Each structure stands twice: as structure tokens, then as C-alpha cells.
UniProtKB/Swiss-Prot annotation:
InterPro entries in the cross-refs: Ribosomal_bS16, Ribosomal_bS16_CS, Ribosomal_bS16_dom_sf
The species this protein was found in: Cyanidioschyzon merolae (strain NIES-3377 / 10D)
Cysteine pairs bridged by disulfides in the record: none
Alphabetical list of HAMAP family matching this protein: Ribosomal_bS16
Protein name listed in UniProt: Small ribosomal subunit protein bS16c
Pfam families assigned: Ribosomal_S16
A Gene Ontology BP annotation from the UniProt entry: mitochondrial translation
Major subcellular location class: plastid
Subcellular location: Plastid, Chloroplast
Length: 75
């Protein structure tokens, strides 16, 4: 099953995340199928490609709760 979820990037103490499509069994920092945007909790910056998310949802991917919140509220 495909999941739309966050992948942590950045250094220690300065988190930053990419919104990616991955298989549900893949590790958090594993290989992503597609990048859909990013989220920086320090600067509160969030950019998400909503068109690509709609395409992936129509193909059967599921969003995690955090990505769902970012998709509805922040982007």
C-alpha cells in the first residue's frame, strides 16, 4: 500500500520534512517514490503540490494524519 507521509531531512535540532509517496513498509528515511512538497516547522513554511496529491489519492494512496492536517490547514 502507498502512503503519503513525511520524510525527515535537515540536521539535528533543525528538523525539516518532505511530503513524499512511499510504500507503507519503507523506513521513515527510506527511498521515496515521489516528492510532493515540504514542511519546515521552524519557519512554519509549507508547500504542497495539491494536484499530484489528488492523483495519488485516486490511485489508492492514503495520507497519514499529519499530512492530512497539513493538506487541509496549512497549504
Amino acid at each position: 500500500m502507498l502512503k503519503i507521509r513525511l520524510k525527515r531531512i535537515g540536521r539535528r535540532g533543525m528538523p525539516s520534512y518532505r511530503v513524499v509517496v512511499m510504500r507503507s513498509q519503507t523506513r521513515r528515511d527510506g527511498k521515496a517514490i515521489e516528492d510532493l512538497g515540504f514542511y519546515n516547522p521552524i519557519s512554519k513554511q509549507c508547500v504542497i503540490n495539491k494536484e499530484r496529491i489528488k492523483v495519488r489519492l485516486s490511485q489508492g494512496a492514503q495520507m497519514t494524519e499529519t499530512v492530512k492536517y497539513l493538506y487541509e490547514v496549512k497549504a
